[in-house]
UniProtKB/Swiss-Prot annotation:
Similarity comment: Belongs to the transferase hexapeptide repeat family. LpxD subfamily.
Subunit structure: Homotrimer.
Entry EC no(s): 2.3.1.191
Protein name, as recorded: UDP-3-O-acylglucosamine N-acyltransferase
UniProt keyword Lipid biosynthesis present: yes
Record flagged with keyword Transmembrane: no
Top-rank taxon: Bacteria
């Protein structure tokens, strides 16, 4: 549940404003001036809270909720209790997310941990760095020579911005994150401990030893990207590593040199993408997916968690398994193996 000690909800949001934002009419008799002071799960929501429901497994909780209002899809609307106002929308979760953004504005983007305004004592900004008005720098952060940082951007404690790095406006760079050899767009969120722009893993291997290949490319991060804690993105070897507009990357992801990730991709925790692979727009990689190098995963494809991708994936595909293959083939193989294993166990007197 939300705790006002950490995140304070915005005052002044009313039931009428909620309905207007969702594009749904209020039921007859509902008071549009009623304040909405929080958001909570169905089970714990109180008489001034907003809740949502879009999964049948929570039907019992819906029937007993005490929420002021609940965002529901049309098929669940009849199950909303009499004391709760049903706000009927085709996509309750998306509507709920939008309303949370209005109610908890400060949770949308990490701010200064020390309520800094300008450069804090204890931070070090090189005289040749260029910071626009409105940049906030927490204690311990370091900004190298030639770096450029746009207005509204926040650097957390002990963040390191290397020489000549460019960061756009309204970004958030988490505590302990490091950025080198990188160009970062606007409204980018980089969470604590992320490592951006370090050497890619490149060696010319041979019997006499392994010769390091200089990594002379960059990392390009476009607008509205979010990068999770302790994720690592290596700079390119001779071309750039690119993360496309609107892409969301979870914690603990490794992206190797020369990887190109398209627009609005989703990459879940534990993924590893080997060098020179391309993800086209709107690709989704489930948790702990491994992708071999020099591949192309087509637009809109989805890869199931813990899969290993070792060949190109056509656009619009749904693949899974090790090695990854179309999900119908994967399921059929798993079912066949399960039946064979069961039959074998019975034949051996184990069934």
């Amino acid at each position: 549940m939300s705790d006002p000690v950490f995140i304070v909800p915005k005052a002044g949001l009313t039931l009428g404003a909620v309905a207007e934002a969702c594009g749904v009419p209020l039921p007859e008799g509902a008071d549009p001036s009623q304040p909405v002071t929080g958001a909570a799960p169905l089970e714990t929501a109180g008489p001034s809270d907003l809740a949502y429901m879009d999964n049948a497994r929570y039907g019992d909780a819906l029937g007993t909720t005490r929420a002021l209002a609940c965002l529901v899809s049309p098929r669940f609307a009849p199950r909303v209790p009499a004391g709760t106002i049903a706000l009927v929308t085709r996509d309750p979760y998306r509507a709920y997310a939008g309303l949370l953004a209005r109610l908890y504005e400060e949770a949308m983007r990490p701010g200064s941990l020390f309520a800094a305004s300008g450069v804090s004592p204890g931070a070090h900004v090189h005289p040749q760095a260029r910071l626009e008005d409105g940049v906030r720098v927490d204690p311990g952060a370091v900004v190298g020579p030639g770096a450029e940082i746009g207005s509204g951007t926040v650097l957390g404690p002990n963040a390191v911005i290397g020489p000549n790095v460019r960061i756009g406006r309204d970004c958030s760079i988490g505590s302990g994150a490091t950025l080198t050899h990188a160009l970062v767009g606007n409204r980018v969120i980089i969470h604590p401990g992320a490592r951006i722009g370090q050497d890619g893993f490149g060696f010319a291997m041979g019997a006499g030893g392994h010769i390091k290949v200089p990594q002379v490319g960059r990392v390009i991060i476009q607008d509205d990207v979010e990068i999770g804690a302790n994720t690592t993105i290596d700079r390119g070897a001779s071309r750039d590593t690119v993360v496309g507009e609107g892409t969301k990357i979870d914690n603990l992801v490794q992206i190797a040199h020369n990887v190109v990730i398209g627009r609005h991709c989703v990459i879940v925790s534990g993924v590893g993408i080997s060098g020179s692979t391309t993800l086209e727009d709107y690709v989704v990689l489930g948790g702990q997916v491994g992708v071999v190098g020099h591949l192309r995963i087509g637009m809109g494809s989805q890869i199931a968690g813990s899969s290993n991708v070792n060949r190109d994936v056509p656009p619009g595909s749904r693949w899974g398994g090790t090695p990854a293959k179309p999900v119908r083939t994967w399921f059929r193989e798993m079912t066949t193996l399960a039946r064979l294993a069961e039959r074998g166990g019975k034949d051996d007197g184990e069934g």
